[in-house]
Regions:
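Serine residues within intrinsically disordered or low-complexity segments
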Residues: 3, 7-10, 43
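Bacterial N-terminal signal peptides that target proteins for export
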Residues: 8-31
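Bacterial N-terminal signal peptides
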Residues: 30-41
Length: 343
């Protein structure tokens, strides 16, 4: 895994820099080439407007992260390593594979992202439609632990037509530099009827939260959380209640060190097809009423699956907004200070 204190990333063709201290408590982004030009040749007003643009803009991650295919559903380890989902066909682990998991790291020497690497088998499952037509090799929605040693994700590798079970949750571990064969998170986590997806751990490191359409919820897809007992057995998941869940769809929790969770919902009153919301944890399974993050990140399109890079100062997500200039869905970032509403 990559370890660094300062590295750069190309963002939509512009040179943007990530500066992380050793404990990754700060994350600073700037557009160096444009900023240098402004300070060298521009007036104070030009410099101020340039700084404003950098701070206020929503930025496309650019190549090689975004491609002509769909990218999204990203997650970060503490060292900045990113795991995300892509439909790109050029690096498929197997022909005809619809969605695979990729790992991307920063290259300090080139000042850009390294070419993403397909995680390959056994993490990414090849299509097995000859076994069941639902087994398309769809591996998505990863969540990596801060130490970079464990990834939870959703897969259709065990999907069955009868009973209909499209997706289950799996976990893989990095052992001696090799990712282990993913293990199914059994019932009561994965179920036949729930179509579980978007797993993650809260900051306590013990509460596994995920989305499920199982019975007993408020709507279509709700967010549930569960813990293991002393013997490692998963306890019955607890619905996170009406301050999080509605009669619509809620999914994809991610939590910062202040206890604030960010997630996706298509509840009424939003800006578009899917919006990003936030809520602050009050205690176990208790949250403040969710608030919409506002028009800086939410558009009339679908804005989904928030993630928090190291340092806590920025928010990333994926969207099919009109300026998705690489593919139908691209990955974007902005400064958290631009969010209209937070708990």
């Amino acid at each position: 895994m990559l370890s660094f204190t300062k590295s750069a990333v190309s963002i939509n063709g512009e040179n943007g820099i990530f500066m992380l201290t050793n404990n990754t408590r700060t994350l600073v982004k700037c557009l160096c080439a444009m900023m240098v030009l402004a300070f060298a040749n521009g007036s104070n007003s030009v410099r101020a407007s340039q700084q404003d643009w950098v701070q206020l803009a929503v930025h496309n991650f650019g190549a090689p992260i975004n491609t002509m295919w769909d990218e999204g559903e990203l997650t970060f380890a503490d060292d900045g390593t990113m795991v995300y989902c892509s439909a790109r066909a050029d690096l498929d682990a197997a022909p005809g594979d619809p969605k695979d998991l990729y790992i991307a790291t920063f290259n300090e020497k080139t000042g850009s992202w390294n070419e993403p690497v397909n995680m390959g088998e056994p993490v990414n499952a090849p299509p097995a439609t000859d076994v069941d037509p639902l087994r398309k090799g769809d591996d998505r929605e990863p969540w990596i632990t801060g130490d970079g040693q464990t990834i939870y994700f959703k897969s259709d590798r065990t999907a069955t037509t009868t009973p209909r079970n499209n997706n289950d949750l799996f976990v893989t571990h990095l052992v001696n530099g090799v990712w282990t064969t993913p293990e199914l998170l059994p019932a009561p986590i994965s179920t036949d009827a729930g179509n579980e997806h978007c797993p993650m751990l809260l900051q306590d490191g013990e509460s596994l939260c995920f989305a499920s359409a199982r019975a007993g919820g408020y709507g279509q897809s709700d967010i549930w959380c569960a813990q293991q007992d002393a013997n490692g057995t998963w306890q019955n998941p607890i619905n996170q209640g009406p301050n999080i869940n509605t009669a619509a769809n809620e999914f994809h929790f991610t939590q910062d060190t202040d206890g604030v969770v960010y997630f996706t919902s298509n509840r009424p009153g939003g800006f578009g097809a899917m919006d990003l919301y936030s809520s602050k944890q009050l205690g176990p399974n208790s949250w403040t009423p969710a608030v919409n993050l506002g028009s800086q990140v939410n558009t009339e399109s679908a804005d989904m699956c928030p993630a928090l890079p190291p340092g806590g100062g920025t928010l990333t997500w994926f969207s099919n907004r009109s300026d998705s200039s690489f593919g139908a869905f691209d990955i974007f970032w902005t400064n958290k200070t631009n969010l209209t509403s937070t708990p």
